[in-house]
Amino acid sequence: MSLLTAFDTTGKSVVSKAVSKLKEFGVEYEVHVMSAHRTPDAAIKFSAEAKKNGFGVIIAAAGMAAHLAGVLAAKTTLPVIGIPCKSAQLDGMDALLATVMMPTGIPVATVAVDGAANAAILAVEMLALSDDSLAEKLENMKADMEKGVAEKDKAMQAKVAEL
């Protein structure tokens, strides 16, 4: 099972967080630079062929007008996850609104501004619906997070007891 990560050049630094998470789960991926505005034909072709090329999910990171995820979603039946990226203007709010406000029939699952790690985890959750080993890795990740919180709580209780 594979995953396609596509992004506009504004999302390059953000995407490294998604790549790290995908590697952590052992998910195959490709990374490409494309733009909804500067290379629309290439983006549309890429998206239209993604499923037949073996991809299971598309992650698209873009800033400012952030139309990449929507353009990709328009030409595929694969799930598309959008990562709105911060830019010098509006601190990423423009990208967030552009990514989340999609017309009926062209959904884009949207994570937080610069939320690449969660985008990767969401993609893994989608892929895990048909992959038991990924599902087990997700369960282990959540169990580890739970242990971490329990350890922090124990440390806090010890500090409070000393007051």
Regions picked out by a protein language model, each given a short descriptive name:
Residues 1-38:
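Glycine-rich phosphate/diphosphate-binding loop of Rossmann-like nucleotide-binding domains
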Residues 11-16, 39-42, 62-71, 90-93, ...:
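Short glycine/serine/threonine-rich phosphate/pyrophosphate-binding segments
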Residues 19-24, 44-47, 91-103:
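Active-site-proximal loop->helix
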Residues 21-24, 70-79, 102, 128:
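Alpha-helix C-terminal capping segments
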Residues 46-84:
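Glycine-rich phosphate-binding loop
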Residues 89-136:
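Short, glycine-/small-residue-rich phosphate/pyrophosphate-handling segment
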Residues 127-163:
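Glycine-rich phosphate/pyrophosphate-binding loop and the adjoining helix
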